[in-house]
């Protein structure tokens, strides 16, 4: 397993609770849209075994063409040990990245794509949308729906409806409106539905989508293949 140590190049305060850390790109480090990585803080591998409390699984919120590895995360008090340390790091501090992989690349199957996210989960979809804007080949349209109870919606400069690009962005701040909209979107029985958020959020979305007749093959989760069965364990086959 290769561990890349790199430096924080810039810290962006997206909202009062959310920051994006832009990391220098190590030589020969590559990724594609929809990737996640493991972020390790200083000392995580100092002992015989890795200190898991100093490691987190994070989505990469940038594309390689942007020249930085973006890690976007929410700091909600009380913070974990990991978030407390990360929140105190400055530009120039070193962090480690390793085990980078993508479960949710943008599928180009001549279908409509629906991006369903909760809060900072939207960061996973930022590079997918940017990649779509660069090249829309074999993607009919993209519709993003994000729920964030704080009302401090993220990346609104990118997630703004653009009819000329066949892109729709919606933000809601309550569950009732959110799930009503999900049911409406599920009227497209041939669409591809990407879902990113907490495990509870994933399960609830899958339940609603499956009840509307969406097949599990049409639902994309940012989870390793071996983790998928627990999310689809409730058989709602039509």
Model-derived regions, located:
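Structured catalytic/translocation cores of nucleotide/phosphate-coupled proteins
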Residues: 1-7, 18-20, 28-31, 107, ...
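Ferredoxin-reductase
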Residues: 2-91, 148
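FNR/FR-type flavoprotein reductase catalytic core
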Residues: 72, 78-238
